[in-house]
């Protein structure tokens, strides 16, 4: 059974159609990338799937729960990390994870916190205040927060955006490890080079339309290209 099923999804802001009848499926444990330039409709799609935006037409199902009629059920099994997510700067990393954990599971709070600490992998800095963290450290803390709840589906908007090479590499390793344990990952990225390493399948989106989708290697072969950037350019033309 697919974890995510999106069929003919349309999302409008007033008269502007941001997402235009897109469809895709994601299997359990897959890392699926929604890839495209800024303004292509990636974040809107992720916000719809995370139940933050209502759809105008089409359907979305998460593990057979319908987005329109069962959003509360969906919220219990997903985790969403927006690109511009922040953390409480006056708290330590540990205190921040503790604060979040209490919203999810009062009985197993300690276990959940330890899981978040392990994922973030900040060492002794976990007990320092968040406002002393670098951007990469903050992002690792936030990824730990998103994944410590053991969601069935983790939705990550531009998880490595703005990070240096080392921190981006660390985030990619975290995502790979979590997916290997059975969590399904839906992420967005405008970095078309990293998705060849990270994603099992991708969908290329431009101006609200999915213009191509499949396994990165299959797309490279189909379009006789060296990388996904070349594929995207050829498809758009």
Q: Model regions: which residues?
A:
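Catalytic Walker B motif of ABC-type/P-loop ATPase nucleotide-binding domains
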Residues: 154-158
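ABC ATPase "signature
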Residues: 213-214
């Amino acid at each position: 059974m697919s974890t995510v099923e999106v069929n003919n999804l349309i999302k409008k802001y007033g008269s502007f159609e941001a997402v235009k009848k897109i469809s895709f499926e994601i299997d359990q444990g897959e890392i699926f990338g929604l890839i495209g330039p800024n303004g292509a409709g990636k974040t809107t799609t992720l916000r719809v799937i995370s139940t933050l935006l209502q759809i105008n037409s089409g359907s979305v199902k998460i593990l057979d729960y319908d987005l329109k009629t069962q959003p509360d059920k969906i919220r219990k099994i997903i985790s969403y990390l927006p690109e511009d997510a922040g953390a409480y700067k006056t708290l330590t990393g540990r205190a921040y994870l503790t604060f979040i954990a209490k919203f999810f599971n009062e009985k197993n709070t300690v276990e959940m916190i330890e899981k978040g600490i392990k994922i973030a992998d900040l060492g002794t800095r976990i007990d320092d205040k968040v406002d002393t963290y670098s951007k990469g450290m903050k992002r690792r803390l936030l990824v730990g927060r998103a994944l410590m709840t053991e969601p069935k589906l983790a939705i990550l908007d531009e998880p490595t955006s703005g990070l240096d090479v080392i921190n981006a590499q660390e985030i990619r390793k975290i995502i790979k490890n979590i997916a290997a344990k059975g969590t399904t990952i839906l992420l967005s990225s405008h970095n078309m080079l990293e998705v060849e390493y990270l994603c099992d399948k991708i969908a290329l989106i431009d101006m609200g339309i999915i213009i191509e989708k499949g396994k990165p290697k299959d797309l490279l072969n189909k379009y006789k290209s060296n990388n996904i950037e070349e594929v995207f350019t050829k498809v758009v033309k």
